[in-house]
């Protein structure tokens, strides 16, 4: 395989990233190729910037009863995302493509989604793709198996990818755990910090921004715009509390396996924030734990993880 045939599509809450890759079977690693392009849902004329997802309890109930009832707004928003993905595929039509997406999936599409519309028939609309990969899995796969990854030599570690939500990852004895099938390993959105806050709502960049906006009647869009706000120090203190809760839960699991966490890698938007602007906050995080923290600030890793997941499937 080479750059002409391998690519990954990383679907997020606001955009799609396409990244081609050069795969080496000799070292079982993928390197970034020449194609890198982002497609924003908001560029579509029908994008609803005020879209509100169906409550998670309702989504889960409908999924479990095999009776998913999409609202008109969900269908419209889903169609925007489908159109965007289809457009992105056009620049890599001659490639073998892997695609990752957040949310709970069936073999046909997205059936539970915390930060967007459900699209239960997604594969029907993206014919070249036979299955949809988990975004969390692709994040950590990219960190391990891409030449730009920060976990290439990690035997026992945890990954915390922060964006619209939290991408959770665990490497145990050199293997990526399937968190959906592992007992005793709740994901960030399942770990309560208080009665109405989870690790995900307090630690993800989107959650941090939402809390600030709700508390201050503001409309801040990006984390970097909060750095010099007086309220931000407390919000980051709450983020640190959530981080420590997550680490404690993960340490408990590793102890049950007679292993110790070797390192923590913080990636995606949260990693980029720490890398670009948040040095003093990173120091607070590092001083709170004896486990070394590394930062992954390259946003291409998830797409490369999707690409190599396809190559090795």
Pin down the residues of each PLM region:
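Short active-site-adjacent structural elements
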Residues: 167-169, 272-278, 303
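Adenine-nucleotide phosphate-binding core of ATP-dependent small-molecule kinases
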Residues: 62-95, 201, 209-274, 292-302
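Conserved glycine-rich phosphate/nucleotide-binding loop
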Residues: 2, 286-313
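Short glycine-rich anion-binding loops that position phosphate/pyrophosphate groups of nucleotides
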Residues: 14, 102-105, 163-165, 270-271
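Short glycine-aspartate micro-motif
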Residues: 6-10, 96-98, 156-161, 265
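Glycine-rich phosphate-binding loop and adjoining helix at the ATP-binding site
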Residues: 45-156, 273-293
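Glycine/GP-enriched mid-protein hinge/lid loop-to-helix segment characteristic of carbohydrate kinases
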Residues: 5, 16-59, 131-133, 146-234
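Glycine/Thr-rich phosphate-binding loops that ligate phosphate moieties of nucleotide
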Residues: 8, 14-16, 20, 25-28, ...
């Amino acid at each position: 395989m080479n750059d002409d045939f391998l690519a990954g599509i990383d679907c997020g809450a606001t955009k799609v990233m396409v990244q081609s890759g050069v795969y080496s079977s000799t070292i079982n690693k993928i390197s970034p190729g020449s194609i890198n392009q982002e497609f924003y849902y908001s560029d579509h004329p029908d994008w609803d910037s005020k879209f509100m997802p169906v409550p998670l309890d309702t989504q889960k109930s409908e999924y479990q009863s095999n009776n998913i009832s999409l609202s008109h707004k969900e269908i419209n928003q889903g169609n925007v995302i489908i159109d965007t993905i289809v457009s992105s595929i056009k620049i890599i039509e001659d490639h073998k493509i892997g695609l990752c997406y957040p949310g709970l999936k069936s073999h046909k599409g997205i059936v539970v989604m915390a930060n967007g519309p459900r699209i239960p028939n997604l594969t029907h609309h993206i014919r070249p793709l036979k299955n949809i990969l988990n975004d969390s899995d692709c994040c950590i796969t990219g960190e391990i198996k891409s030449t730009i990854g920060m976990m290439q030599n990690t035997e026992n570690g945890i990954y915390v990818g922060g964006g619209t939500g939290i991408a959770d990852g665990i490497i145990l004895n050199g293997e990526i755990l399937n968190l959906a099938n592992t007992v005793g390993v709740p994901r960030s959105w399942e770990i309560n910090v208080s009665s109405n806050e989870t690790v995900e709502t307090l630690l993800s960049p989107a959650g941090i921004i939402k809390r600030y906006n709700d508390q201050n009647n503001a409309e801040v869009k990006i984390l970097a715009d909060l750095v010099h706000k007086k309220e931000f120090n407390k919000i980051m203190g709450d983020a640190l509390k959530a981080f420590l809760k997550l680490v404690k839960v993960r340490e408990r699991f590793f102890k049950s396996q007679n292993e110790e966490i070797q390192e923590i890698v913080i990636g995606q938007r949260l990693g980029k924030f720490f890398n670009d602007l948040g040095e003093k906050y990173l120091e607070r995080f590092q001083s709170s734990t004896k486990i070394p923290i590394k930062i992954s600030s390259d946003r291409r890793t998830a797409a490369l993880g999707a690409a190599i997941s396809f190559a090795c499937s």
